[in-house]
């Protein structure tokens, strides 16, 4: 790809005019969440970005991915068209009528994006089976790149997690059966030089003094590797440990490996690129020793799905400790694998590392053993359900079945809204219909811009060959809508499920309650789906590439929905009125501004050095007779709403965390069976109102809400600017925030 000599940019005069015309639709938490999540540090100005600067960066980073600009002499008409599109995108995103994924808000338009094409995609999927590294940016030197290796999917996972992405991975029986037996017991030694600032801490984690070890083991045969101070170095270290256990990647049967961690930067050192500070080598030491111990215990045996998940979880745990604030994993096992389904009941292992993934099981439409799964869900909210058969054979359920619809699907991203092939990422943009209409957009125009934004992301330079190949083949996009419940009430005055009728399931003979859907909402959603498909086809024709295999989704949203103050994805508001508690680092200069504006602030009872700020929130249409919250809407209506969106809107999948009351637990198995031909993926959690101190969300009544609001005055943004003379501090984030309602995704 040629480098552009003159990329498309947005003129300062244009941006100034937009700022006069359009007011961003900030939610109650919007500006504060943005400032501590997506506003990048500007070293020359010694402050973080303002919203218009973020949007400018994001739009310019995206529009210039259009491959027609990467030629010696781009067509002037193409340049003019894209320049106009960039202006419209700026208006759409600046007003918060729609936004790309949190990953794009953080990375698009940065040097990091240019170096790491993977960085624009939030989440990925990989199958745990031996795979070749191929022409990828990370390839072990000990064997040909064409050699299938057990380490490859774990290297892919480790790499993408450290770039801030989430990873779904499959440990279903068909994949696990392809893993060879563990052949070699490995004596792993991690050494460190005394000149390392991490020397003392590393010894505590199990490393040994390099000089002393070399003196005591002079002349011994062992593989040695000095790890470089890079992300790739961490990945390759883990690959070496795994590879030494298997015959195909350790044909000599070498039983000793020495890894030198002296060059890894110490805790607190700057991390350039993605941002943040280093953890030091200590988490890496712990992970390498734990994984080696696990594999040594299986010599002469095949790994189980639990073993394979444990390795993934140990990697995820390390990434969290390595200063990527959240590591999102979803492990997909077989529905008849009892050990996998119950693996989190081992409390010791759960607290050590098994917390690192949400676990789901793969089913098909013939599966009918829902009772054990329903009991497990009622107990701890897992496993989730993923119907791979539906994902492969259907786009929208309303459209005809086709065995070639999406035949390569093997799993999903951690939140379950995108059906994915091996090595494939999700690629998201969401529109907030209520905000878009309020700001004068025709919804067809907003969704067309969304489709084109996502399409351009597929032309990034991807680091892994497995990803490049499948992205070029599928060009998958995921245009989502969020604030769906707000939209239904605002534009149609009612929820989409108008009632239920009793019918007999022709396969089971059981009586079920079939939902009745509002025809006007159905027509509107169906029309917008075809808008996205048509926009993708037109753009694909112009670019000379394949149309996207699938186009639409409902992402769970979360942080991005907070920006605009809308309901999250298809989810119902948590309550009509509530206190939302946000945790800040104790030295955050936003805290004095929030205090000056009257927000209640108190120390976090769980974490030292953290402050909790209370934000009173009123859901849109909270007083509407048709309003329902997650605490009042039935489990049946939630699943029926998900089924509606899977039928008429999403050709990928619909991410939904269905909440249920204790008295509804006995309905879970029946509902999962009833919708086995409709719902591609779902998860369920018991509804928790405010069962512990400083809960993130606490339902309140309208009187309490008004009392809380009466104490608040002024603009936090304005007060912050005055107090800090338009300066800020670097590397501050909100604590324990996630990019989705279910908590599975990284924040950015």
Swiss-Prot record:
InterPro entries: RdRp_reductase_class-2 (IPR050862), RNR-II_ins_dom (IPR054158), RNR_alpha_hel (IPR040763), RTP_Rdtase_AdoCbl-dep (IPR013345). The keyword Oxidoreductase applies. Residues 151-162 are annotated as: Effector region-1. Its EC number is 1.17.4.2. The gene is rtpR. The active site is at 415, 417. Residues 692-733 are annotated as: Adenosylcobalamin-binding-2. Keywords: Allosteric enzyme, Cobalamin, Cobalt, Disulfide bond, DNA replication, Oxidoreductase, Redox-active center. Belongs to the class II ribonucleoside-triphosphate reductase family. Residues 572-633 are annotated as: Adenosylcobalamin-binding-1. Allosterically regulated by ATP and dNTP. SUPFAM superfamilies: PFL-like glycyl radical enzymes (SSF51998). The lineage of its organism: Bacteria, Bacillati, Bacillota, Bacilli, Lactobacillales. It comes from Lacticaseibacillus paracasei (strain ATCC 334 / BCRC 17002 / CCUG 31169 / CIP 107868 / KCTC 3260 / NRRL B-441). GO terms for biological process: DNA replication. Its cofactor is adenosylcob(III)alamin. GO terms for molecular function: cobalamin binding; nucleotide binding; ribonucleoside-diphosphate reductase activity, thioredoxin disulfide as acceptor; ribonucleoside-triphosphate reductase (thioredoxin) activity. Monomer. This is Adenosylcobalamin-dependent ribonucleoside-triphosphate reductase. It is an enzyme of class 1 (oxidoreductase). It comes from the Bacteria. Disulfide bonds join 123-426. Residues 172-320 are annotated as: Effector region-2. It catalyses: a 2'-deoxyribonucleoside 5'-triphosphate + [thioredoxin]-disulfide + H2O = a ribonucleoside 5'-triphosphate + [thioredoxin]-dithiol.
């Amino acid at each position: 790809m040629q480098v552009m000599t003159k990329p498309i940019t947005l003129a300062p005069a244009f941006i100034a005019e937009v700022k006069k015309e359009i007011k961003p639709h900030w939610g109650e938490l919007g500006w504060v969440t943005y400032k501590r999540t997506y506003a990048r540090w500007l070293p020359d100005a010694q402050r973080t970005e303002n919203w218009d600067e973020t949007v400018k960066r994001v739009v310019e980073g995206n529009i210039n991915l259009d491959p027609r600009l990467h030629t010696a002499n781009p067509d002037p008409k193409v340049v003019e068209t894209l320049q106009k599109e960039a202006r419209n995108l700026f208006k759409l995103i600046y007003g918060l009528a729609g936004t790309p994924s949190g990953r794009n808000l953080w990375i698009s338009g940065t040097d990091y994006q240019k170096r790491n094409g993977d960085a624009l995609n939030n989440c990925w999927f990989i199958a745990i089976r031996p795979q070749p590294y191929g022409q990828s940016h990370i390839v072990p030197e000990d064997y040909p790149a064409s050699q299938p290796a057990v380490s490859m999917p774990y290297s892919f996972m480790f790499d993408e997690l450290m770039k801030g992405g989430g990873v779904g991975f499959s440990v279903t029986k068909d994949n696990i059966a392809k893993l060879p037996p563990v052949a070699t017991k490995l004596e792993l030694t991690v050494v460190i030089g005394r000149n390392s600032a991490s020397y003392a801490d590393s010894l505590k984690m199990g490393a040994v003094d390099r000089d002393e070890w070399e003196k005591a083991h002079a002349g011994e045969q062992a593989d040695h590797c000095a790890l470089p101070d890079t992300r790739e170095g961490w990945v390759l270290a883990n690959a070496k440990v795994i590879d030494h256990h298997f015959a195909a990647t350790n044909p000599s049967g070498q039983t000793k490996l020495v890894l030198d961690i002296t060059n890894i930067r110490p805790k607190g050192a700057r991390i350039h690129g993605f941002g943040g500070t280093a953890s030091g080598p200590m988490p890496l030491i712990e992970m390498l020793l734990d994984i080696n111990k696990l594999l040594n215990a299986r010599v002469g045996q095949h790994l189980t799905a639990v073993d394979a998940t444990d390795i993934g979880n140990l990697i995820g745990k390390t990434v969290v400790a390595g200063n990527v604030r959240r590591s999102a994993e979803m492990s997909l096992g077989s529905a008849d694998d009892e050990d996998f389904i119950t693996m989190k009941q081992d409390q010791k292992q759960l607290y050590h590392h098994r917390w690192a993934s949400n676990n789901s099981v793969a089913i098909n439409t013939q599966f009918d053993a829902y009772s054990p799964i329903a009991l497990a869900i009622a107990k701890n909210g897992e496993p989730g359900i993923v119907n791979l058969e539906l994902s492969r054979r259907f786009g929208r359920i309303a459209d005809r079945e086709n065995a070639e619809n999406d035949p390569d699907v093997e799993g999903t991203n951690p939140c379950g809204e995108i059906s994915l092939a091996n090595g494939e990422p999700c690629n998201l943009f969401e529109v907030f219909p209520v905000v878009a209409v309020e700001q004068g957009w025709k919804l067809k125009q907003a969704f067309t811009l969304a489709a084109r934004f996502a399409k351009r992301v597929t032309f990034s330079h991807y680091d892994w060959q497995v990803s490049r190949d499948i992205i070029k083949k599928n060009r998958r996009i995921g245009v989502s809508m969020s604030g769906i419940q707000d939209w239904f009430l605002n534009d149609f005055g009612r929820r989409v499920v108008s009632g239920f009728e009793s019918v007999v399931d022709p396969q089971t003979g059981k009586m079920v309650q079939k939902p009745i859907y509002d025809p006007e909402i159905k027509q509107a959603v169906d029309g917008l789906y075809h808008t996205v498909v048509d926009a993708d086809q037109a753009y694909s024709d112009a670019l000379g590439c394949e149309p996207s295999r699938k186009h639409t989704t409902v992402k769970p949203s979360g942080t991005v929905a907070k920006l605009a103050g809308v309901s999250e994805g298809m989810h119902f508001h948590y309550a009509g009125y509530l206190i939302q508690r946000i945790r800040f680092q104790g030295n955050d200069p936003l805290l004095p501004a929030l205090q000056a504006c009257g927000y209640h602030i108190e120390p976090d009872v769980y974490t030292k050095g953290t402050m909790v700020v209370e934000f009173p929130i009123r859901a849109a249409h909270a007083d509407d007779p048709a309003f329902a919250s997650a605490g009042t809407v039935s489990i049946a209506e939630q699943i029926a709403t998900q089924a509606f969106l899977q039928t008429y809107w999403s050709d990928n999948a619909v991410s939904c965390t269905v909440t249920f009351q204790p008295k509804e637990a006995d309905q879970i198995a029946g509902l999962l069976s009833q919708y086995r031909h409709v719902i591609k993926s779902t998860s369920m959690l018991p509804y928790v109102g405010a069962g512990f101190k400083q809960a993130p969300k606490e339902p309140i009544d309208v009187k309490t809400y008004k009392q809380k609001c009466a104490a608040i005055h002024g603009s936090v943004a304005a007060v912050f600017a005055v107090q800090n003379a338009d300066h800020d501090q670097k590397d501050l984030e909100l604590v324990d925030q996630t990019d989705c309602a279910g908590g599975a995704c990284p924040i950015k």
